[in-house]
Amino acid sequence: MYLGIVSTACAFLLWNHGLQLLNASSGGLFFFFQPLVGTLLGWILLGEQIGGTFWIGSFLILSGVLLVIKEKEKEVKS
């Protein structure tokens, strides 16, 4: 329970800080990192096991965020 509260609070704080630096559509993308942060904190702080599905999911999340960022860069250049 502690880890869930801490990881969620950290994710919200970082997300709110990011919204101050970026516009809402770009900052909203980083909200998808919350499950990654929570799982990694569980692994580091509590010694939880991370399976292969976590790495697959992490890859998909990171790929999706990068894809959207690249598409937005193309729109800005046009």
From Swiss-Prot:
Keywords on record: Cell membrane, Membrane, Transmembrane, Transmembrane helix, Transport
Keyword flag Mitochondrion: no
Transmembrane segments: 2-22, 27-47, 49-69
Keyword GTP-binding assigned: no
Localization: Cell membrane
Family note: Belongs to the EamA transporter family.
Name by which UniProt lists this protein: Putative permease-like protein YdzE
Provenance organism: Bacillus subtilis (strain 168)
Gene that this polypeptide is encoded by: ydzE
